[in-house]
């Protein structure tokens, strides 16, 4: 567990040092297993499901909040007041979560980790 935590810490530090990508946005991509390890070793994060409310209600990761990708625009997001807090982003298959991560980065959020879609999520899920 200590090695996994050290690996994640290194990953986070490296992501903070990387140059922005071609689109000018900066977020890290991690695996679902890395997201689980982060959730097990930290409490200072928020899980954001960027699917539609209907998809979210069918099945989502426990404690995730639903902010549909289509609603992330150019203004502040009330559910995410701390722009430095770790934001773990996912969708169904990974496409919308990448788009949302780029938009969040453009809004000034600095600690974003995108981990794909719930289709490949090995952990627990709940429904509304």
PLM ranges: what are they?
Residues 46-49:
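Structural scaffold elements adjacent to functional motifs in cytosolic proteins
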Residues 2-8, 13-38, 54-86, 92-128:
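Rhodanese-like catalytic fold shared by cysteine-dependent sulfurtransferases
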């Amino acid at each position: 567990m200590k090695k996994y935590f050290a690996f994640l810490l290194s990953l986070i530090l490296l992501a903070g040092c990387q140059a922005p990508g071609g689109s000018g946005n900066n977020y890290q991509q991690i695996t679902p297993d890395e997201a689980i390890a982060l959730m097990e070793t930290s409490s200072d994060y928020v899980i954001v499901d960027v699917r539609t409310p209907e998809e979210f209600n069918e099945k989502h990761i426990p404690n995730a909040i639903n902010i549909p990708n289509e609603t992330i625009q150019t203004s502040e997001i009330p559910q995410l007041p701390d722009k430095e807090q770790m934001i773990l982003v996912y969708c169904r298959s990974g496409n919308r979560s990448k788009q949302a991560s780029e938009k969040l980065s453009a809004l000034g959020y600095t600690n974003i980790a995108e981990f794909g879609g719930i289709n490949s999520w090995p952990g627990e899920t709940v429904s509304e």
